[in-house]
């Protein structure tokens, strides 16, 4: 078994590592073959997203995980890219990022037009890759077209859909078309999508992909040792799900991703601000936010149906019962206005929360109109 080396300052390459027996057992049982598990898809009862009858095997092997007790290097890293997102974060601005989902279409002109219209109000557009493990138009193609239209993008890359050979090519290709930011995730298991016969790759997990991105940028070499003629300059992001089990190690896991090379962290949708505050305190204890920036996910709920879906189907969302109950009392034609006002207030509270550097706005069920209605009402970046 091999892991990508994670020591600060080391040459980040594939090196053999001894794996404790209990961790080997967990690796063998994990449907995603996680090397640095557990993933963010664990249900509240501890069951695996790929098999409800399987308790996540990593829950019994937490002490043996290679990323425990991370030592985050002091201070911010040197500038990574020439992008607007990194510049805004370094300047202390509160950034606004809009989530985009590519369509089931070979024509991306509509997507480009809609998000280009949002560009004056957002710092960047985060392009999801095959969301919920269902196929859509290629993320890199959408990014190339949006960058050409003057919209800064964050390209999502999942380990589900590529091995390390393809990952290296895609990282180089992203930089070649003007992408400054990448977001490295393990990816939902294919069983969550609409083609359950598909097989996930999972040659790497999110930790491995983060290290791989940093290796290409910092050592200017591919994993096999070949020197790059022109290395990429990428601002590397990682995911956090603060309210997914095992709760007690989520902040530590984020800190370990920062050690691996993550420059910014984007969370799943958050509603519980007191719990978020406790999570941020834990991140500070690990000094993770001394080096990386935290961007909090905000779901734009515009209907009772959306609220119930989030509450039922999205691990860690913690949609307040009070919000669901309130929407249930509001006529359908007024739920949208209420939801937008609720979201705006939530963003304003996050802006005042120490440790939060921005928000990632999720339009639910393809409702791009909700973004268009919301972002002009936000305070400008400052």
Give the ranges of each region predicted by the language model.
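N-terminal amphipathic alpha-helix/helix-capping segment at the start of soluble metabolic enzymes
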Residues: 2, 69-101, 105, 109, ...
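Active-site pocket-lining/capping segments in soluble small-molecule metabolic enzymes
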Residues: 77-78, 187, 200-229, 239-244, ...
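Hydrophobic faces of well-ordered beta-strands that scaffold small-molecule active sites
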Residues: 96-101, 123-127, 153-157, 182-184, ...
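Catalytic cores of alpha/beta
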Residues: 164-176, 248-255, 278-281, 302-309, ...
């Amino acid at each position: 078994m091999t892991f990508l080396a994670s020591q600060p300052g080391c040459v980040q390459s594939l090196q053999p590592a001894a794996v404790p027996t209990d961790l080997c057992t967990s690796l063998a049982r994990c449907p995603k073959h996680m090397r640095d598990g557990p993933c963010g898809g664990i249900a509240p009862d501890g069951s695996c997203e790929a098999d409800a009858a399987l308790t996540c095997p990593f829950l019994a092997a937490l002490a043996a995980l290679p990323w425990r007790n991370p030592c985050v290097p002091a201070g911010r890293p040197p500038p990574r890219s020439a992008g607007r997102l990194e510049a805004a974060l370094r300047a202390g601005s509160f950034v606004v990022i809009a989530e985009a989902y590519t369509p089931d279409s070979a024509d991306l002109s509509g997507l480009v037009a809609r998000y280009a219209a949002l560009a004056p109000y957002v710092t960047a557009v985060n392009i999801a890759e095959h969301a919920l493990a269902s196929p859509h138009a290629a993320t890199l193609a959408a990014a190339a077209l949006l960058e050409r239209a003057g919209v800064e993008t964050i390209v999502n890359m999942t380990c589900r859909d590529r091995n390390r050979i393809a990952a290296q090519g895609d990282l180089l290709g992203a930089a070649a078309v003007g992408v400054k930011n990448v977001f490295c995730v393990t990816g939902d298991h294919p069983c969550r999508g609409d083609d359950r016969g598909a097989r996930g790759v999972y040659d790497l997990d999110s930790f491995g992909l983060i290290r791989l991105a940093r290796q290409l940028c910092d050592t200017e070499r591919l994993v096999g040792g070949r020197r790059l003629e022109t290395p990429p300059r990428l601002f590397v992001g990682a995911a956090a799900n603060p309210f997914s089990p095992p709760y007690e190690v989520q902040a530590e896991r984020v800190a370990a991703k920062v050690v691996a090379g993550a420059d910014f962290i984007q969370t799943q949708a958050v509603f519980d601000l007191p719990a978020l505050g406790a999570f941020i305190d834990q991140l500070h204890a690990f000094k993770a936010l001394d080096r990386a920036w935290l961007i909090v996910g905000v779901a734009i709920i515009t209907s009772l149906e959306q609220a119930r879906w989030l509450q039922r189907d999205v691990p860690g969302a913690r949609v307040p019962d009070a919000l669901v109950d309130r929407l249930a009392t509001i006529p359908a034609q007024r739920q949208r206005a209420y939801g937008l006002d609720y979201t705006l207030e939530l963003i304003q509270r996050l802006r005042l929360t120490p440790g939060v550097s921005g928000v990632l706005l999720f339009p639910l069920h393809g409702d791009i109109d909700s973004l268009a209605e919301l972002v002009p009402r936000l305070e400008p970046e400052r």
